[in-house]
Amino acid sequence: MVPKLFTSPICLLLLLGLMGVEGSLHAKPGQFTWAQWFEIQHINMTSGQCTNAMLVINNYQRRCKNQNTFLLTTFADVVHVCGNPSMPCPSNTSLNNCHHSGVQVPLIHCNLTTPSQNISNCKYTQTTANKFYIVACNNSDPVRDPPQYPVVPVHLDRVI
């Protein structure tokens, strides 16, 4: 007894569940703008150790994120990258709002090594490097983002 593809209620529920999981992996918490969420995820490394720093992000998302990269630079410096020439985004070439950093920055890449349902028990290893990065930038939220930044980073697209 094999369910018919896409007509079975079970297949439909599985498909919707997978779509929901994929959507939630990239969702930002509602209280933040995309720029604020970018800063939390990729600039504000609250601790020098990934396991502790990732706890901040994981608390907002209520799950252990598989990996994350922290750029050891300032938000203002990343905003400045948004002024570099636009290019297609490597992760989605139909988007043309990406910008290459032009200079390497120190960064820390965190990789989940011990997943857990309890986010306090998730453990990460970290790798340090100096690399270029590519960010996607959009117009800022005129009400909630700093007014001195009309264009802001919203997504770390690639580290190279």
UniProtKB/Swiss-Prot annotation:
Active site: 42 (proton acceptor), 155 (proton donor)
Any GO MF annotation of the entry: lyase activity
Residues carrying sugar: 34, 44, 92, 111, 118, 138
Keyword Signal among record annotations: yes
SUPFAM superfamilies: RNase A-like
GO CC annotation: extracellular space; lysosome
EC number(s) from the headed UniProt entry: 4.6.1.18
Regions that span the bilayer: none
3'-nitrotyrosine PTM positions: 60
The keyword Signal is annotated on this UniProt entry: yes
Disulfide bonds: 50-110, 64-122, 82-137, 89-98
UniProt-listed CDD domains: RNase_A_canonical
Cell compartment(s), UniProt: Lysosome; Cytoplasmic granule
Family (UniProt): Belongs to the pancreatic ribonuclease family.
Subunit description: Interacts with and forms a tight 1:1 complex with RNH1. Dimerization of two such complexes may occur.
The protein's name: Non-secretory ribonuclease
Organism: Chlorocebus aethiops
Lineage: Eukaryota, Metazoa, Chordata, Craniata, Vertebrata
